[in-house]
Amino acid sequence: MVNDLDRGRFPKAWFGEWAPDPPVFDWATELLNVAIRDQPDAAWDLILILVERAPHDDALGWVGAGPLEDLLCEHGPIFIERAEVIANGDERFRKCLSRVWGSNRMEPGVYERMCQAAPGPRGERP
């Protein structure tokens, strides 16, 4: 699904789509949305690339509140242990994970584990 060329240009394109207010979604957002639905392991890899290459804390928030939240809501039991392990040793990932809300869409056990792995101000979005 994602070749080396995409891995190189994907983060730049994705952050470029999410930077405007409101965001202007294009191929990178769509690619990740499809991956979350159909190829969650590929989506996980792309999310980790985004966390690594996020240019600032706001961008980490976009990743957390967007694709990471969607992945954990749709496939949380598969990915929560991976998220816990990475959050334990990676401050950037932990900060990104702290931006995930999703309590009304996520399995309660997954949500509790996520909150323990990355405490942060959470609530329901208006």
Task: Give the ranges of each region predicted by the language model.
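Alpha-helical solenoid scaffolds in large eukaryotic transport, assembly, and signaling factors
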Residues: 2-115
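Low-complexity intrinsically disordered segments
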Residues: 118-126
